[in-house]
Amino acid sequence: MSKRIKIIFIIILLIATKTSLNAQRIALTTNLVEDALVTPNIGVDIVVADNQSVTFDASYAPYKLSQQFYNKCMTFRAGYKYWFNQALYAHYIGVDAVVNSSDVKMGKHGGRDEYIALGVGYGYSFIIGKKLNLVPSIGVGLAFGQSYEGHDHMIEPGKGVQAVATRGVKPVVTRLGLTLQYVLK
């Protein structure tokens, strides 16, 4: 991941944690969609007001089966959620900041991305136990960064004719999940 992306992510974290952390409730989360894609992930929702929470999550997939088949992906997400009822229950809308670095290859097809994305999202928290919730969510936004797509995407720009480098802004899904949420407090 480039140094610029790391610095911007640290700034986002510092701004997000500037809010009052006298949380009444904290919840640990894992995204079952990413788990199904064999991408380990963990997150935390911190309630900062009666109907507001901040969320942080990360996922990492370091898998390389061969030179032709691999998935190397690292994603960090920080977000703010406004709950229409009590925090961690029922409907919410939110904003997300995402930092992603991925390198995927499946046979002759592959791509490498590094981007920062900002987006809006919606979700609903279903209570399935005393301290357990199931939260389907979706978010869309814009990504700012660079991509390399093509057969030999690992070859540096200028050294390989089959790699196509693009820079700019593109629409992305910033959050897609079926999250299992365990409320600690």
Residues covered by each model-derived region:
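Bacterial Sec-dependent N-terminal signal peptides
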Residues: 1-26, 180, 184
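Short N-terminal segments immediately surrounding and downstream of signal-peptide cleavage
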Residues: 25-39
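Extracellular/periplasm-exposed beta-strand and loop segments of Gram-negative cell-envelope proteins
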Residues: 31, 58-71, 101-115, 144-154, ...
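Short secondary-structure boundary/capping segments within folded domains
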Residues: 34, 45-48, 170
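Short, surface-exposed coil-to-beta transition loops
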Residues: 38-41, 119
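Gram-negative (and chloroplast) outer-membrane scaffold detector with strong preference
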Residues: 46-136, 182
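Outer-membrane beta-barrel "beta-signal"
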Residues: 80-83, 170-185
